[in-house]
């Protein structure tokens, strides 16, 4: 029955025309509702709310599951979810406003704007703090399931103390050489904003973002959320949901965590950015360009926004607590058109990646626009389909109608394999990695990923044999 349902969903998914602001494709709402139900069954999602918009028009918003499984209270589009690190998007936007006004230079040392930074941080640019390429240490550790700053029974009592704790830690790497996601980076940005405005961070964010945009359901800290609307966070353990029981963050940490919000408020925020209501769109488009790392490659953060470039689109956004994600996608310029996708959950039994969830909405909402998202969803269906005709059908679709450029397909399948391994287990991902070696038998990377998957399953002999094959393929020809 599951496969029949999944097959029907996939047929609808791939037949759907792209949504447009002039008219909704027939059945889009029912297709997205079906996808939400599929995701809930597939990953054991407690509760979820999803919004899809194009050029300012909301094409779909819906919810399913329970905002509080303990009381069986249903999730609704007005439920308030713990968005955690999506708080960084507000902080980044506040800094970008100062850049837009010519008051902050991202390539100047943050010490120009913040006094008393640790000596080792004096030359670190604002951009590196935004993009997690600063190399600084963290201001807390996880000790017995609690946040603890060194020298304190819990987290440091205030912002200055927290910065001193982080400053006492050794530099983790040369600034600008690589990326390490570190909350202390956003303490520096919080200090920068509070120094400039001479106000506490929450007051700045309310005055410059929340109040002008009427984001009345957005706040910080679970204690700020009405119990009748709170989506209680859960995590997966041994395939079962259990309460997350997350520690609250101190208010000085609200620039990086503890955001509480709804799909509607996040849509208002992203729409305002896309239309120049918070800062000029030409400034945004410059700031959402990749940072080159001295250690090689590009940073996947652009002024603090998680950034990918796929299907001709620049896609920016952020995860929150691994449970939620917001994404804004535009092709070329924001003026040429944009999409907004917001996918909020309060947890899943399989701890599904938020990127996997938001891409499932992209695959259904605009399949012709986002073929990489369609590929991801199709591969997930293949990994779960044990029928004999699953592989020939998958290969036929990949050959004839997948929409991903040939030169990008191997890498895309490999990346999707890892996402499937994380959310559904190595056993399901094995099918995808095996398929990739069949499609690209001369790829050392494809065989290496397959070997790694066998190793994760405890199949050491098979893993060693495949690692050897990958190594042989990687050797340059004499």
Where in the sequence are the language-model features?
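Catalytic loop of the DD-peptidase/beta-lactamase superfamily, centered on the K-T-G motif
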Residues: 22-62, 194-199, 203-207, 211, ...
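Active-site-proximal loop and beta-strand segments within enzyme catalytic domains
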Residues: 26, 42, 46, 66-182, ...
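Alpha-helical scaffold elements that line and support the substrate/ligand-binding pocket
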Residues: 50-57, 82-105, 109, 129, ...
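Catalytic-site signature segments of enzymes, centered on catalytic residues
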Residues: 63, 78, 141-144, 149-227, ...
């Amino acid at each position: 029955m599951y496969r029949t349902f999944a097959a029907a969903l996939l047929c609808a998914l791939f037949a759907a025309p792209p949504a447009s602001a002039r008219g909704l494709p027939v059945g889009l709402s029912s297709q997205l509702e079906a996808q939400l139900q599929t995701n809930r069954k597939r990953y054991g999602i407690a509760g979820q709310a999803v919004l899809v918009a194009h050029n300012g028009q909301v094409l779909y918003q819906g919810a399913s599951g329970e905002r509080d499984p303990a009381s069986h209270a249903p999730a609704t589009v007005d439920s308030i979810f713990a968005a955690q690190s999506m708080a960084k998007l507000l902080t980044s936007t506040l800094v970008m406003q100062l850049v837009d006004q010519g008051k902050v230079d991202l390539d100047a040392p943050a010490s120009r704007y913040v006094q008393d930074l640790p000596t080792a941080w004096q030359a670190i640019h604002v951009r590196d703090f935004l993009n997690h390429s600063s190399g600084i240490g963290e201001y807390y550790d996880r000790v017995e399931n609690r946040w603890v700053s060194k020298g304190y029974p819990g987290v440091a009592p205030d912002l200055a103390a927290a910065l001193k704790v982080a400053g006492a830690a050794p530099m983790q790497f040369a600034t600008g050489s690589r990326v390490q996601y570190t909350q202390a980076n956003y303490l520096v940005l919080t200090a920068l904003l509070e120094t400039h405005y001479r106000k506490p961070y929450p007051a700045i964010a309310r005055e410059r973002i929340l109040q002008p945009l009427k984001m009345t359901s957005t706040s910080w800290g679970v204690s700020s959320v009405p119990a009748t609307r709170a989506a209680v966070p859960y995590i997966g353990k041994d395939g079962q949901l259990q309460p997350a029981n997350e520690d609250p963050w101190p208010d000085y940490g609200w620039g990086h965590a503890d955001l509480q919000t709804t799909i509607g408020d996040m849509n208002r925020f992203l729409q305002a950015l896309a239309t120049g209501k918070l800062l000029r769109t030409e400034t945004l488009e410059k700031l959402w360009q990749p940072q080159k790392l001295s250690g090689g490659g590009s940073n996947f953060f652009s002024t603090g926004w998680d950034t990918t470039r796929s299907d001709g689109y620049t896609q920016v956004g952020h995860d929150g607590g691994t449970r939620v994600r917001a994404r804004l996608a535009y092709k070329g310029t924001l003026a040429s058109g944009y999409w907004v996708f917001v996918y909020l959950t309060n947890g899943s039994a399989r701890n599904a990646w938020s990127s996997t969830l938001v891409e499932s909405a992209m695959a259904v909402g605009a399949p012709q626009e986002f073929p990489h998202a369609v590929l991801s969803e199709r591969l997930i269906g293949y990994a779960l389909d044990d029928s004999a005709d699953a592989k020939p059908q998958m290969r036929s679709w990949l050959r004839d109608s997948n929409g991903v450029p040939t030169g990008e397909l191997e890498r895309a399948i490999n990346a999707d394999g890892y996402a499937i391994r994380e959310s559904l287990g190595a056993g399901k991902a094995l099918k995808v990695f095996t398929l990739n070696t069949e499609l690209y038998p001369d790829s050392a990377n494809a065989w290496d990923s397959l070997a790694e998957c066998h190793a994760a399953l405890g199949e050491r002999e098979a893993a060693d044999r495949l690692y050897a094959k990958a190594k042989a393929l990687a050797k340059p020809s004499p």
